[in-house]
């Protein structure tokens, strides 16, 4: 049934106190009041853990509210706690008001007992009815037995009251001490051999528990040590290069953190996800699985996932947040996978995180007893070489098993159930299997524009430096686009002198940026008198052996899914102390205690960069092998290849240690990053640099030709896999993330000829790239290719991270877009105004979908200008933004001069009556608009009157959506008058508008004179069941 947790958090205690302090807790609690508070009661019963729920059952059983048969019905293994809580409420409600009152009292007793346990009454140890007394004093007996079940079982077995099998069943490691005590009492209830009398007598002799274990000195000492340990690990932010140590408090900058929304769920349109604070990680509603314990944070490489966890650890250790957890255990997945020996939960927590100096048994039991006060964090799940599976079940917290089985069962809740777990990962590593066990999923999207600026100001407090850097970024959109990932912002900060002094162009591609940081490190490792200006061939050639050693190590690590390197592995790769001193290898974070300090690359992207460098320049790499990198005939994708024996770097002479084998075994998302870097290194831009370092220019030319051929072939294969269009329809394709990386590789190579060739093969009418982690850098790559399309395309980029900077990157391809969908992309007025400024000159662009962004009245003038100037524009969807009456009035001016618009979406804004009036006046004589949505805009009867006048005049509008307003009967009566004179409207949606039978009657009278209208939606209004039946019979066009 899982581990218990007798304590609840401060927030939960407060909520419970508020609920129990209301009328439900008094003697006058009625069944109606009980039912009205059902959702709050369910939340209360499941807010702590299974221990709190079972404590409530103890009290109800002792008061005979529940019969023995009722009680047994709540002990079905594997049932979610929320299901059990609802079943308990149903059972109690059916028993009447007295039972409802008793459940409230039981919840009060259980809450009080969790905070300050006390002995409730006493009993006669020589009772004539021992089984009945065991039941009536059950809560106190469970508390007495808590730490003495083992001894009591041994004694009962010696006396012959229980069998060895029964002892083993009660001792199963999945049960906590309290659960074992309850199962012993349950056994005594059904056995008629004297066990009940034996327990009643001997439990009386046990010592009374004086205090919660949480208050014990041993526990407090361990908690203090754990806080100190976590604080020491998280107080300072080691920069990627390890060259400087910054106080995390001084440098930490909030990232854009959003909760993942299931767009497939039914219900009203959702607003764009709000940017959350870290402190909301465990309190956000909208759970994927209410019974799961694991919180997932996904983000691209370099988006700041590790730093976010470090911030969480620091806030907890400093006592500033997350204080509902008494124990926080941080782990790194790249460190965990290095553990070859089997280990248990106890070994993991104590030997690989924080060792208790005294009382190890008591402290571990405490963790098992109170899992809801425990938080475990696992950073970098994408770097864990074992793929998640739920096939191997492991439920014992003391029995050792493999590290992957241990981790997977922790995430599923088979171990330390009710303990919170936080996992960070790149999106590609999260499978559908894992998502089944996720409570809440968050997207970490990197820095906002304000975040980039704030970070640079925190890094550079010298007068003027930050201002100059920010101006440089704002003037260089490609570089600005890269910086939304914190790792690039760090690079810009690190190389600020080089960037500000550069006379040529600023870095444009990812490869440019990494070569700049390489130059920075090489210059700082070179004596001042011999250092040249910039990354010249002589500088690179002088350290080429070092770079190749690092590249060989990086490539081997990718092939082996190894990201932390021991001294032996460094030696086998011929990495010398001089190579290490260059600064790209740093001491691994979260080093396993007792081991020698291993090293790791500054960041996973640096490991990929050096692997690409090795592939570009090493004489050991035949050019033909590059096909494995660009997905051209990769046998390593087959299941058989994945089962090949793992190799070791020491056996480099073996067949499996070849470059091909390494590329076949590497994780796909790491190969994609490496491929993009290799394409950039082999570009014409960097040809001269590499040619000076290559003994054979012919070999470099062959590599370059091979990379071009592989890229072109992979794109051709991707395009040929697109199924043909249905007759009469445009060809549509939903591109996958792999396609994005091929486009990014093409962009890194910066060859217009290849881009034009790729565009010729993309013969589609609708290109869909939703949920593909498209940020500003990907937008630049897409525009680089799509601008060469011969036919216009509808480009759909919903649910990505485009932002204002990404919009700017898309402008070069706007001329070939016939429609652009940018739903849920954190775009503000600034980005849209730039987009529209360009769209004024793009005759192909006829549709814009911008709902679920951050648009306000500030963009209304640009929108109005677009409508007034572009007389072939067809659709403008602005739903779920922040536009008010003022913005609607400005937009109405543009509508008056427009003769082409067919679809106008305004749902979920704040236009109110004044905005509705302005739009209605502009649309009265409009000759093309067919669909208008003003759902959820706070429109009342005044706005409805204006819309009714519009309906009386308009002869084109076919659908009007007015749900979720407050039109009421007065507004509906006005609309009914307008319908009497209208001859075009086919669908009128009026759901959820506080309409009564009076308003419906007015609509029926209008429908008698209107044969055009096909549907009137009236769901969610204030009709009785009789009125619904009556109205439906009178006219079937009323949808009730």
Curated annotation (Swiss-Prot):
Palmitoylated by ZDHHC5; palmitoylation is required for proper recruitment to the bacterial entry site and hence for proper signaling upon cognate peptidoglycan detection. Palmitoylation promotes localization to the cell membrane. Palmitoylation protects from SQSTM1/p62-dependent autophagic degradation. This is Nucleotide-binding oligomerization domain-containing protein 2. Belongs to the NOD1-NOD2 family. GO terms for molecular function: ADP binding; ATP binding; muramyl dipeptide binding; pattern recognition receptor activity; ubiquitin binding. A lipid is attached at residues 395, 1033 (S-palmitoyl cysteine). PANTHER family: NACHT, LRR AND CARD DOMAINS-CONTAINING. Residues 241-274 are annotated as: Required for CARD9 binding. A motif (ATG16L1-binding motif) lies at residues 63-77. Homooligomer: homooligomerizes following muramyl dipeptide (MDP)-binding, promoting RIPK2 recruitment. Interacts (via CARD domain) with RIPK2 (via CARD domain). Following RIPK2 recruitment, RIPK2 homooligomerizes via its CARD domain and forms long filaments named RIPosomes. Interacts (via CARD domain) with ubiquitin; inhibiting interaction with RIPK2. Component of a signaling complex consisting of ARHGEF2, NOD2 and RIPK2. Interacts with ANKRD17 (via N-terminus). Interacts with HSPA1A; the interaction enhances NOD2 stability. ATP binds at residues 299-306. ADP binds at residues 239, 252-253, 302-307, 603. It comes from Pan troglodytes. Keywords: Adaptive immunity, ATP-binding, Autophagy, Cell membrane, Cytoplasm, Glycoprotein, Immunity, Innate immunity, Leucine-rich repeat, Lipoprotein, Membrane, Mitochondrion, Nucleotide-binding, Palmitate, Repeat, Ubl conjugation. It is found in: Cell membrane; Basolateral cell membrane; Cytoplasm; Mitochondrion. The gene is NOD2. Residues 293-618 form the NACHT domain.
């Amino acid at each position: 049934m899982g581990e218990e947790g007798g304590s609840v958090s401060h927030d939960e205690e407060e909520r419970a106190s508020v609920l129990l302090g209301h009328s439900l807790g008094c003697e006058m609690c009625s069944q109606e009041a009980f039912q009205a508070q059902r959702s709050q009661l369910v939340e209360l019963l499941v807010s702590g853990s299974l221990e709190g729920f079972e404590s409530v059952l103890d009290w109800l059983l002792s008061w005979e509210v529940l019969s023995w048969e009722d009680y047994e019905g709540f002990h079905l293994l594997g049932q979610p706690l929320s299901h059990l809580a609802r079943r308990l409420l149903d059972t109690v409600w059916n028993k009447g008001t007295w039972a409802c009152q008793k459940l409230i009292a039981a919840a009060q007793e259980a809450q009080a007992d969790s905070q300050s346990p006390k002995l409730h009454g006493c009993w006669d140890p020589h009772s004539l009815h021992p089984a009945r007394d065991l039941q009536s004093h059950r809560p106190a007996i469970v508390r007495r037995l808590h730490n003495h079940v083992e001894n009591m079982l041994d004694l009962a077995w010696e006396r012959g009251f229980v069998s060895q099998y029964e002892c083993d069943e009660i001792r199963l490691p999945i049960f906590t001490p309290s659960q074992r005590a309850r199962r012993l009492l349950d056994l005594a209830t059904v056995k008629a051999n004297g066990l009940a009398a034996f327990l009643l007598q001997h439990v009386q002799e046990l010592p009374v528990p004086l205090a919660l274990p949480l208050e014990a000195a041993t526990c407090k000492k361990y908690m203090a040590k754990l806080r100190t340990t976590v604080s020491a690990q998280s107080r300072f932010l080691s920069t990627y290069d390890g060259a400087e140590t910054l106080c995390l408090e001084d440098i930490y900058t909030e990232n854009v953190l959003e909760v993942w929304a299931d767009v497939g769920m039914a219900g009203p349109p959702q607003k764009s996800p709000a940017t959350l604070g870290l402190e909301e990680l465990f309190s956000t509603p909208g759970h994927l699985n209410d019974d799961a314990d694991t919180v997932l944070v996904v983000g691209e490489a370099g988006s700041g996932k590790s730093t976010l966890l470090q911030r969480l650890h620091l806030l907890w250790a400093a006592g500033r947040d997350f204080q509902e957890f008494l124990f926080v255990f941080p782990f790194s997945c790249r460190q965990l996978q290095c553990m070859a020996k089997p280990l248990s939960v106890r070994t993991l927590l104590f030997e690989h995180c924080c060792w208790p100096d005294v009382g190890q048994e008591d402290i571990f039991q405490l963790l098992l007893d109170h899992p809801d006060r425990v938080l475990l964090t696992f950073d970098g799940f994408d770097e864990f070489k074992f793929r998640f599976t739920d096939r191997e079940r492991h439920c014992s917290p003391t029995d050792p098993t493999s590290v992957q089985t241990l981790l997977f069962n922790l995430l599923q809740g088979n171990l330390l159930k009710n303990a919170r777990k936080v996992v960070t990962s790149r999106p590609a590593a999260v499978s559908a299997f894992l998502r089944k066990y996720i409570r809440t999923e968050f997207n970490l999207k990197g820095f906002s524009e304000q975040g980039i600026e704030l970070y640079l100001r925190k890094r550079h407090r010298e007068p003027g430096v930050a201002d100059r850097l920010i101006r440089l970024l704002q003037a260089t959109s490609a570089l600005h686009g890269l910086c939304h990932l914190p790792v690039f912002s760090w690079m810009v900060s690190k190389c600020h002198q080089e960037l500000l002094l550069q006379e040529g162009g600023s870095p444009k591609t990812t490869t440019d940026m990494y070569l700049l940081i390489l130059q920075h490190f090489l210059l700082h490792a070179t004596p001042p008198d011999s250092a040249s200006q910039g990354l010249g061939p002589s500088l690179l050639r002088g350290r080429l052996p070092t770079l190749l050693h690092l590249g060989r190590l990086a490539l081997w690590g990718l092939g082996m899914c190894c990201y932390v390197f021991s001294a032996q592995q460094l030696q086998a790769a011929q990495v010398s102390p001089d190579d290490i001193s260059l600064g790209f290898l740093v001491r691994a974070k979260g080093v396993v205690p007792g081991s020698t300090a291993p090293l790791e690359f500054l960041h996973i992207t640096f490991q990929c960069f050096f692997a690409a460098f090795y592939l570009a320049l090493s004489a050991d790499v035949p050019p033909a092998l590059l096909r494995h990198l660009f997905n051209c005939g990769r046998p390593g994708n087959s299941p058989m290849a994945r089962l090949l024996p793992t190799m070791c770097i020491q056996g480099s002479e073996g067949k499996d240690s070849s470059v091909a084998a390494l590329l076949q075994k590497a994780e796909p998302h790491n190969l994609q990053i490496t491929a993009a870097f290799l394409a950039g290194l082999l570009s014409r831009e960097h040809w001269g640099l590499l040619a000076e370092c290559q003994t054979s220019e012919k070999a470099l030319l062959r590599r370059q030709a091979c990379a071009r051929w592989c890229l072109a072939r992979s794109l051709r294969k991707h395009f040929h896999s697109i199924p043909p269009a249905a007759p009469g329809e445009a060809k549509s394709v939903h591109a996958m993330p792999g396609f994005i990386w091929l486009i990014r590789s093409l962009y890194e190579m910066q060859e217009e000829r290849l881009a034009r060739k790729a565009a010729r093969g993309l013969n589609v009418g609708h290109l869909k790239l939703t949920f593909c982690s498209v940020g500003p850098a990907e937008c630049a790559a897409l525009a680089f290719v799509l601008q060469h399309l011969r036919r216009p395309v509808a480009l759909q980029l919903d649910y990505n991270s485009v932002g204002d900077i990404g919009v700017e990157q898309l402008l070069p391809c706007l001329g070939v877009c016939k429609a652009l969908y940018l739903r849920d992309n954190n775009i503000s007025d600034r980005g849209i105004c730039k987009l529209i400024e360009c769209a004024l000159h793009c005759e192909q662009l006829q549709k814009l979908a911008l709902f679920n962004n951050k648009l306000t009245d500030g963009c209304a003038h640009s929108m109005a200008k677009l409508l007034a100037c572009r007389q072939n524009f067809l659709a403008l969807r602005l739903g779920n933004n922040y536009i008010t009456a003022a913005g609607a009035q400005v937009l109405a001016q543009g509508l008056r001069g427009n003769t082409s618009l067919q679809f106008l979406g305004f749902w979920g804004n704040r236009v109110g009556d004044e905005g509705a009036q302005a739009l209605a006046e502009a649309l009265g004589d409009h000759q093309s608009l067919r669909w208008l949505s003003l759902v959820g805009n706070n429109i009342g009867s005044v706005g409805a009157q204006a819309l009714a006048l519009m309906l009386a005049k308009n002869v084109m509008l076919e659908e009007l959506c007015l749900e979720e307003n407050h039109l009421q009967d007065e507004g509906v009566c006005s609309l009914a008058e307008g319908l009497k004179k209208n001859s075009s409207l086919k669908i009128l949606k009026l759901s959820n508008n506080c309409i009564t039978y009076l308003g419906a009657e007015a609509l029926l009278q209008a429908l008698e004179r209107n044969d055009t209208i096909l549907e009137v939606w009236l769901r969610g209004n204030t009709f009785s069941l009789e009125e619904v039946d009556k109205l439906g019979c009178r006219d079937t066009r009323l949808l009730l």
